[in-house]
Amino acid sequence: MAASKKAVLGPLVGAVDQGTSSTRFLVFNSRTAELLSHHQVEIKQEFPREGWVEQDPKEILHSVYECIEKTCEKLGQLNIGISNIKAIGVSNQRETTVVWDKITGEPLYNAVVWLDLRTQSTVESLSKRIPGNNNFVKSKTGLPLSTYFSAVKLRWLLDNVRKVQKAVEEKRALFGTIDSWLIWSLTGGVNGGVHCTDVTNASRTMLFNIHSLEWDKQLCEFFGIPMEILPHVRSSSEIYGLMKAGALEGVPISGCLGDQSAALVGQMCFQIGQAKNTYGTGCFLLCNTGHKCVFSDHGLLTTVAYKLGRDKPVYYALEGSVAIAGAVIRWLRDNLGIIKTSEEIEKLAKEVGTSYGCYFVPAFSGLYAPYWEPSARGIICGLTQFTNKCHIAFAALEAVCFQTREILDAMNRDCGIPLSHLQVDGGMTSNKILMQLQADILYIPVVKPLMPETTALGAAMAAGAAEGVDVWSLEPEDLSAVTMERFEPQINAEESEIRYSTWKKAVMKSMGWVTTQSPEGGDPSVFCSLPLGFFIVSSMAMLIGARYISGIP
């Protein structure tokens, strides 16, 4: 019996969603925003030294081609012709840094991932040269001087990798974040590939002036970055070039947004004061501040939200960034073996329904917002002989929620108007225990779209709306209504506050582990007076606890 033909109402738009943990290609109906098909490939992360995180740029590129081909095959099985795909958008992990040879097309080193900490000494050295406690950088970029952003990663490559140095000397080097590497490669690479980025990704490099929307000569001189290796900066919605290979050869790439900006667009947060929180490898809360750069007094970033067209106005956002969210689940799976699959975490947490006084601060890459404390490291505290892997699983989920509470509190103080509810998205939002915990800890409702792929949707919307494509209207009256699932707080406010205040104590204990300096704004005496015996006893306790949890006699 022949397969029934599926009706396709209107043009289709594809989206590459290249994240820290995986690559996906998804295809949407531009009239209804319905997700028709997708394919996903997990991406390896390499940890060559403590604090270092790398990925293979060629593996990332190959995963994009694989996802496109597999998705097109699935569309064929649904009797949907791929000729209906009129445009492709790109969303990507931000800050991750790639340098490649424009003559050979080969990467000159692995991609240095946003989580990577190798540049801490570079940051400390540079900070001594900045008057006014980093305000020189922050006033231009909206960002604190941190290992998180691309400029110091690029500086490290220029200082330490001979291949990169030689390519720069010979005028063969190109720099880009993951979007630039992908767009250059997909539009032809060595045969005329387009070397560009969009304003949202450029704003995460620490080299981009968010007021003039241009690469900043002063910043490039300060970091010692040759401007000729930087990509051309474009809007988030315009035709950059055409696909030059694969099943979708000839289709325009016409949308590009850093993943968190893409999620803001996909959640349709187009009004001032609208906010969303994305739960992925990290956790990122963005609030639309309109055409105005709002600078935080409470540890948040100021960043470009989007610019949806060459002649369209730029929108800005306040952002709270948490380094480790979904990554803590991966760590429990891959490093400790507490779970075999990421999905098991919900089952373990549900078994106990409490952390039983156990608190987990997953500061594997230091602490991001609102502390910006690179000296912090991960701790699990409050352990007793009763603690088991279920309690640790529950504490890991709570940690994601507590970190979100910290950045939401900071955002409420900066904006002056507390959020009445929190819109959420990302892979972790399928975990109902996590979503209920989040509502309890924030003590406001949490709402999530039933179609969770908002990051890819945002990239598709930008691509479909581009001039010359024009298959997706972003006018408010044309946007599809989003069906939401709602989680209401189920504990009283007092209990919520007690749990949160205990978490804050745990956070303070995580600081000051890897430098002799005290955490910014903290009391140095707290960290200078810890006796050696404390570290010996705590280390023994952790060892015994680990053996107990793993069942080693």
Swiss-Prot record:
Coiled coil: none annotated. It comes from the Eukaryota. ATP binds at R24, T281, G326, G427, M428, T429, S430, N431. GO terms for molecular function: ATP binding; glycerol kinase activity. Its main location: mitochondrion. It catalyses: glycerol + ATP = sn-glycerol 3-phosphate + ADP + H(+). Pfam families: FGGY_C (PF02782), FGGY_N (PF00370). GO terms for cellular component: mitochondrial outer membrane; mitochondrion. GO terms for biological process: glycerol catabolic process; glycerol metabolic process; glycerol-3-phosphate biosynthetic process; triglyceride metabolic process. May be involved in the regulation of glycerol uptake and metabolism. Belongs to the FGGY kinase family. This is Glycerol kinase 3. The gene is GK3.
